[in-house]
Amino acid sequence: MPSLKSLKTRVSSIKSISKITRAMQMVASAKLRRAESRLAAARPYAKRMAQVMSLLAARAAGTPNALPLLNGRGKDQTHLLIVTSSDAGLCGGFNSNIYRQARDRALALEAAGKTVQFYVIGIKNAPVIRNNFPGKTIHETKREETSPVTFENAQKIAQDLIQRFNAGEFDVAHLFFSHYHSVLSQVPTETQIIPAAPEGDDTKNQAAANDASSGAIEFEPDEETILSTLLPRSIAVAIYQAMLENATSEQGSRMSAMENSTRNAGEMISKLSIQYNRLRQAAITTELVEIISGAEAL
């Protein structure tokens, strides 16, 4: 049975931790509002970029001079899994959820006889990937490469990926991140960014291609020239969008985790306080009994 002193020490420690988690919850709440604003501003551009690329891809796909970034190199043996994560912890299951989805995809690809490599954006998922897939990580970003989240940082990562693709290091690249819906809902998401995957419904893509072919849509200059400029940018936009989604999901997950921690701390303090008061009452009762027994003996 714990002593009064140990219970008092535990209550004091939990109260201190509760103050920290409450402060972290407030900080995460403030950061979340800013992240939501940035994400809301970026989503329409990313969506429109995907629509433009879908249209251009539908028109140019299959042509003899189609770019490798658009149609690939005719093989899909080596798959690069770009796994994002946070640079800080204490954000619930945010990082582990992304890792699990990437892990499941990696195991499925290996079972199909494919070669899997990892490109890790963010610090927290790097160690677990190294431990579970030793020797398969080709790059791990440093904190200064991803913080703060800017389009310039996303462009640098995109340029590195394109150089590695052109050098033949991989054939297909999949991007894993957490799509933000709300404070209570962040969904691990996978998207193929190299070569460019068709967006949306195939029927709509074909209709767009037919419109473009029939002259309903005119391109100046030609589609291939536009693609050579927009394809690298679309990869950077996809990475930037994933980083923004991750940053917002991270703060939402951290806010929720710290709120739960603060509530659990309050419940623990209540239980320990009751236990402390009962022990103290029992000790006082014992002392009174001893005093009365001693008085009667006299």
UniProtKB/Swiss-Prot annotation:
Its main location: membrane. PROSITE patterns: ATPASE_GAMMA. Keywords: ATP synthesis, Cell inner membrane, Cell membrane, CF(1), Hydrogen ion transport, Ion transport, Membrane, Transport. One of its GO terms (molecular function) is ATP binding. It is a peripheral membrane protein. GO terms for cellular component: plasma membrane; proton-transporting ATP synthase complex. GO terms for biological process: proton motive force-driven plasma membrane ATP synthesis. It is found in: Cell inner membrane. Gene3D superfamilies: 3.40.1380.10, ATP synthase, gamma subunit, helix hairpin domain. Produces ATP from ADP in the presence of a proton gradient across the membrane. The gamma chain is believed to be important in regulating ATPase activity and the flow of protons through the CF(0) complex. PANTHER family: ATP SYNTHASE GAMMA CHAIN, ATP SYNTHASE SUBUNIT GAMMA, MITOCHONDRIAL. Belongs to the ATPase gamma chain family. F-type ATPases have 2 components, CF(1) - the catalytic core - and CF(0) - the membrane proton channel. CF(1) has five subunits: alpha(3), beta(3), gamma(1), delta(1), epsilon(1). CF(0) has three main subunits: a, b and c. HAMAP family: ATP_synth_gamma_bact. NCBIfam families: ATPsyn_F1gamma (TIGR01146), PRK05621.1-4 (NF004146). This is ATP synthase gamma chain. It comes from Zymomonas mobilis subsp. mobilis (strain ATCC 31821 / ZM4 / CP4). The gene is atpG.
